[in-house]
Amino acid sequence: MERLAIFPFSNLTGDAALDWVTKAGPAILAQELAGGARVLPLRASTTGIAALQYATQLLHCTFTQRNGALQIQYALEDANSHRMIATGSIDGTALFAVSALARTLDANGAHPFSTANPDAAAAWGRGEFERAVALDPDFGTAWASWIAQTAQAGKPDVAVELAGRALARASLRTPLDKAQIQLSNATLRRDGAGRAAAFTELTRLAPHESGPLLGLATIEQQARRYSAAAELYRRALAIDPRNADALNFLGYAQGESGDLEDAKKTFETYGQIQPNNALDSLGEVYFMNGRFADAEKSFAQVSARDPNFLKGAPLMKAAYAHWLGGDLPGADALMQKYLAFLSKQNDPRAVWYGAVWFYATGRQEQALAMLAKAPAEQAANMERQRAVWRGEAHIPDDLNQLRAVYQNANPAADGLPRTLYAEALVKAGKTDEARALLKLWPLPEAGSDSLLQSLMYPRYLALRKALKIQ
C-alpha cells in the first residue's frame, strides 16, 4: 500500500475567492481515497511531517484558471528517490477535478465524494455548512462539519439535534460520513456503547485508517480489556509505526495486563520518539506491578536527565517506590528533594504535599505538624484536610456510585476510586471482586489536590493485609 502525503494545494489564480480550494481540495481527495486497498491518504503540511508519517509518495498540486474553468496541476513524487512518478493537469470545477485526480491515483479504490453538487461542495469548502446542507440535504460531510462546528461553539444540544436530523435521512451519503456522525452523536450524548459501535463501523469501512482503531483501543483499555486494547494498538501501529500515543498506550495496556517484557520493548521503541516520557511510563508500569526497585530506577533516570520534567513528578514517584520497596528513611530523603524542588518553584502546595506524604506513610502526628506550617492563605483548605483525617468528612462509600467512578477513571490514574470501590466491595462481602481490584498497585498522583488522596495508600495497604494478599 502506498502511503500518500497530500500537501495543501497552491492557489496560483490570484483570486482570493478561490482560497478555499487550498484546504478543501486535499480534504475531498483524502475522503475519496479513504478505505481503498492501494492508497492510504495522509494529510501533511510539510515534507518533514510527511517523513514522520512514513509517506512513500508525495502529491504536490497547484491550481490556476483557464478559459474560466479551474485547472489543477499535479505532480506525484517518490518520497525516497525524489523522482517524479506522474504529472498532469485536469480542468473543471474544483469537485470534478479533484474527483478525477482521485480516480487517476487509485482507479479501483477511489469512491465519490458525499456530494455531486459543485455549489454545495464550494459552500462546504468556504465553511458555509448550513448553506451546503440546504443545497444538498444528503451531503454527509457537510452535516458532519456543521455538527462539529456547533459542538465546538458550546452548543452540544443543538449539535445533537443536527446529528438526529442528519441520521434520519435514509439517503445520507456516504456510509463513512454516517458512521462519523454516529460517533459525534454518541460522544455528545456520552453514550459509551454508541461510541464503541461507531468506532467499530469506522474500522470496518476504513480498515487502513489508524484513527478509528485508536479510538476503539482507548475504549477497550478504559473497560480494562487490556488484551483487546493491545491488539487494536498493534493494528494502528502497523499503519502508523511512529504514532507516539499508540506506542505509549500500548505499553500501558501490556503493563496493565502484567506483560512487562513486551511493555518494556514497546517503551524502548517509544523512547526513540519521546525518551523521557517513555522512561516515566515504564516506571509507572513497573510500579503498578509491584516492581518498585525497577520503577525507582526508571523515575531516577528521568529526574537526572531533566529535573523539571512533569514538574518534578518522577522524583516524587521515586520516593513512593523507595518507601514501598521497604526503606522509609531513604524514601524520606527523596521526598525532601522533591519538596525542596517545589519550594524553589514557589509552588504553594509544597507544605501540603509534605503533609500528605507523612500521612500516607503512617505518620499522622508529623502530618498534622506539617499542615500547621502552611501559609495563612491556605488555612481553610488545611482545616478541611484535618477534618478528613479526623474522620469528620464524608468519604464516598456507595457501592454503585464508586463502581461508576472507577469505570470512568483512566486505569493508570484510578488509584483512589479503585481503592474506595474495593473497600465497598469488601463491606458488601464481595471479596473476590475486591481482590481482583488490588492486583495492580495504585500510582501516586502528582498534581492531585484531592483532600482524600492521602487516604489511598493506608487504605489500600489495609485491604491487602485484610485479604492476605502478598
Segments from the language model and where they lie:
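Acidic, proline/glycine-rich low-complexity intrinsically disordered segments
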Residues: 1-298, 303-309, 314
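Alpha-helical protein-protein interaction modules
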Residues: 157, 193, 212, 222-225, ...
